Design a protein with these regions (language model features):
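Scaffold/interface architecture of coatomer-like assemblies
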Residues: 15-306
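Bacterial N-terminal signal peptides
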Residues: 3-15
Length: 306
């Protein structure tokens, strides 16, 4: 079976279109909701009120409201690289991290699990059944190449239309070597999705000038070039969605990272506003500011209205 047919068969299994066209960041009942993280020195800043925020829609300041995040559960799709390079200690640390993340989910929070090598597999759909999720994590095994582009698309589709707060959490340790989707196709997918994207990637030092084929760029690249391109692409995608890229030099920190990210997800702010009528169709730029000196603000850069 060819690379394209492997990917296509998974998309058809989920009832997804072959071409990733127009998954929308939807404006429900003409109210726009922006998921925002505010931090300083790597730590969340909780307890900010409405007056601490300024939100600009196409350069115009809007009146905003803050939704109590404790009343809106999480819908998190966890997308795990299980290619051959993850075998051994790395996989054990990865599984421990995901188990800890699942244990930290509360109440009506839901999670889904997707694993990928050159195949993309939906291990568990969105569920609040912790036992099902733990079993799905234990069932993964490493083999094959890496198709994280296609897996990210599947993760975004899994939370599309979610009634809770949609988040995709991606782990990958390598450059894409097998996907149907190319680098330049990913940013429009993320911008049109309503999900916040987080990504975790190890920073590995490989000796020598070795090369490997990059499916995402359709060319041969050195390991250093691959790492640089992957990091740049992941940072672009996560920042566009209002999420973050986490790089780690130690896979032994994965459990801590997963736990910290779940805590961060629970301390984000939900801002809402109503655009003035008539609402122009197409892309609208969003900028969020806070009146806290030195604070970092992570929020999506805009929304589509159709």
């Amino acid at each position: 079976m060819t690379q394209a047919s492997l990917t296509l068969s998974f998309f058809l299994l989920l009832g997804l279109p072959q071409e990733p066209t127009r998954p929308l960041f939807r404006v429900s009942t003409e109210v726009v909701q922006i998921d925002v993280f505010v931090g300083k020195d790597g730590k969340a800043i909780p307890g900010l009120g409405r007056t601490a925020f300024s939100l600009y829609d196409d350069g115009e300041e809007r009146d905003i409201e803050i939704v109590d995040v404790t009343t809106v559960p999480l819908d998190v799709t966890i997308v795990l690289d299980t290619s051959a390079s993850v075998a051994g200690t790395k996989l054990r640390n990865l599984q421990s991290g995901v188990h800890a993340f699942i244990d930290g989910l509360e109440g009506k929070d839901r999670a889904a699990l997707i694993s990928f090598s050159q195949h993309v597999s939906l291990r568990a759909g969105l569920t609040s059944d912790r036992a099902e999720l733990h079993d799905a994590v234990d069932a993964v095994s490493p083999f094959g190449a890496t198709a994280w582009h296609d897996a990210l698309f599947a993760g975004l589709k899994t939370v599309e239309g979610a009634t809770h707060r949609p988040i995709v959490l991606l782990f990958s340790d390598g450059d894409d070597t097998y996907s149907f989707l190319l680098d330049e196709q990913l940013l429009p997918l993320v911008e049109h999705s309503d999900a916040v994207l987080y990504a975790i990637t190890p920073v590995e030092r490989r000796p020598g000038p070795g090369t490997a084929f990059s499916a995402g760029r359709e060319q041969w690249l050195s390991f250093q070039e691959q790492r640089s391109r992957r990091t740049k692409l992941l940072r672009t995608l996560t920042e566009a969605s209002g999420g973050r890229l986490i790089e780690t030099e130690s896979v032994g920190r994965l459990q801590q990272i997963f736990v910290e990210l779940l805590a961060e997800m629970k301390t984000r702010y939900l801002l809402t506003f109503e655009p003035p009528h008539p609402i122009r169709q197409g892309w609208h730029d969003i900028e969020v500011e806070v009146n806290v000196r030195g604070a970092d603000v992570h929020a999506r850069r805009g929304y589509f209205y159709e």
